[in-house]
């Protein structure tokens, strides 16, 4: 890929300006999200821990989606607040986000400091791969959060923060048990 891949789609200076503006808007959104996340993780470190996958992440993910797709051998796991598939996606997003930020900084520095061509070429290639990976991740995120029928009941909770009790019992049994036990301890 690299820079040549994207340049092949641009034939006029107006198209180049549009491409740079789109990149600027995307970079601003990406950086806002990155710094928002960093601030959130610093202010509430426990939230970061609940996003990390556990040792059963792969088998839990396979069972979760196997049960959703109706495979009889798949047993629905005791998911907590976040599914293990979401926790694995979290690690992927952190890795790709760090890759894009690091390579973006290298690509920006090249305008101030004379860097070797192979460094800039490698940074460009990795930045482009990260971009494609993040776009595919975004599409998968929208697909699994909004488009598949099994998410339709839980999607509104991502907006208003509330979920019907029966849905919480079904979709997030481990989290539901934690909440009930905390409520019983408080009584």
Predicted regions and their residues:
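Membrane-embedded alpha-helical bundles that constitute the cytochrome b-like, heme-associated redox core
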Residues: 1-187
């Amino acid at each position: 890929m690299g820079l040549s891949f994207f340049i092949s789609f641009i034939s006029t200076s107006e198209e180049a300006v549009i491409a740079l503006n789109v990149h600027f808007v995307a970079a601003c959104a990406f950086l806002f999200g990155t710094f928002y996340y960093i601030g959130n993780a610093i202010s509430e470190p426990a939230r970061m821990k609940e996003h990390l996958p556990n040792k059963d992440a792969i088998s839990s993910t396979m069972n979760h989606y196997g049960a959703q797709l109706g495979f009889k051998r798949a047993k629905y796991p005791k998911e907590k607040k976040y599914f293990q598939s979401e926790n694995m996606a979290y690690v992927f997003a952190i890795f790709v986000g760090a890759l894009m930020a690091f390579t973006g900084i290298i690509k920006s520095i090249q305008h101030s400091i004379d860097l070797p061509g192979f460094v800039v070429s490698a940074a460009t290639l990795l930045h482009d791969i990260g971009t494609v990976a993040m776009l595919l991740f975004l599409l998968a995120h929208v697909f699994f959060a909004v488009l598949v029928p099994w998410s339709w009941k839980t999607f509104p909770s991502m907006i208003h923060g509330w979920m019907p009790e029966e849905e919480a019992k079904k979709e997030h049994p481990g989290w539901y048990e934690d909440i009930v036990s905390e409520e019983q301890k408080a009584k």
